[in-house]
Swiss-Prot record:
Protein's UniProt name: Glucan endo-1,3-beta-glucosidase GII
Known role: May provide a degree of protection against microbial invasion of germinated barley grain through its ability to degrade fungal cell wall polysaccharides. Hydrolyzes laminarin in vitro.
Active site: 122, 259
EC category: hydrolase
Residue ranges the record marks as coiled coil: none
Keyword Hydrolase attached: yes
Signal peptide extent: 1-28
UniProt xrefs under InterPro entries: Glyco_hydro_17, Glyco_hydro_17_plant, Glycoside_hydrolase_SF
Documented EC number(s): 3.2.1.39
Chemical reaction(s) catalysed: Hydrolysis of (1->3)-beta-D-glucosidic linkages in (1->3)-beta-D-glucans
Family: Belongs to the glycosyl hydrolase 17 family.
Organism: Hordeum vulgare (Barley)
Amino acid sequence: MARKDVASMFAAALFIGAFAAVPTSVQSIGVCYGVIGNNLPSRSDVVQLYRSKGINGMRIYFADGQALSALRNSGIGLILDIGNDQLANIAASTSNAASWVQNNVRPYYPAVNIKYIAAGNEVQGGATQSILPAMRNLNAALSAAGLGAIKVSTSIRFDEVANSFPPSAGVFKNAYMTDVARLLASTGAPLLANVYPYFAYRDNPGSISLNYATFQPGTTVRDQNNGLTYTSLFDAMVDAVYAALEKAGAPAVKVVVSESGWPSAGGFAASAGNARTYNQGLINHVGGGTPKKREALETYIFAMFNENQKTGDATERSFGLFNPDKSPAYNIQF
C-alpha cells in the first residue's frame, strides 16, 4: 500500500445531510497480510490467528512459500500477488509465466484456496506496459496447467480513475486500462481496486466530513447524473470504478476491493478510534454492496499487522488490526 493521491473531485459537491445507511453483514471479508517487519509472528501462527478470528480471506504480496504452506487446508481464500519487480519477466514470455505457475501455484493448489493472482500492485509509469502481457501469459499458463479456475487480475490505485466525482463520471485515465478491463471481461475475472477514503479525507478535511469518510450517519451526497444517493465516501469511490469499467466496455466486470483501511497513528485523523470506526463500518457495510451494485462486495482490509519496517509516511506502519504480539490494536468484530 502506497500513499494515495486521491482526486479532489469528491470535495466539489459534498454537503451535510441526515440520511444514514443501514449496515449489512458480509459473508466473506479478507485481511491483507504484509511481512515488512522484524517482530511479526510465524506464518503458521498468523494462519491460526486468521482462523480463530473467523477471517476467511487473505492477500499476500509475493509468492511466500512459508505462508502458502501454512495455508494448506485452511479454507482461507487467497489473493496471491506477483511482485511488481517480476512483471516484466512474466510479460516477456509464456514460458516464464509457466515456470512461475509451476513453482508458485501448482505445488499448493487446491490445498491452498488461491482465488486470484494479482499481476502487480499499483503499478506505475512505464512498468504498466507489462501488465496486460503478463496477465495474458499467466492466463495461458494456468489454462495449460489445468488451473483455469484461478482468475488473473491486477490491483490498481484509485487514482487510475479520473473524474471520480460524481461517481457516474468515473473514467480510466490511462488507455491501457481499457484493454485490461476487456481482458477481465473475457475471462470472468474481477478488477482488484485499492480504495482508501482515509486519504481523500486527509487531503480535503474542510470539504469531506469525517462521518462520510467513516460510515457514520449525517452526510448525503446525490449523483445528479443518475439520482443515486451516497452516505459513505467508500461507496462513491467504488461506484466510480464501476462507472469507469462501463465506459471501458466492461460493464459486467466485478470489483473486488483489494485494500482498504484506516491508520491508527502517525498522521492527521489517524487514531485507534477512527480506525476502529472505519474498519468496523467497512465490515458491517460491504455485504449490502453499493448504490450502483446491490450485491456483496468482496473486500480486503489493509492490514493484519502494524509493520515496523515499512517506509514512507508514519501512517504506513500503523494500518494493522493487530500488534506483532497478536493482541488487537483495537477491538473489532468480524
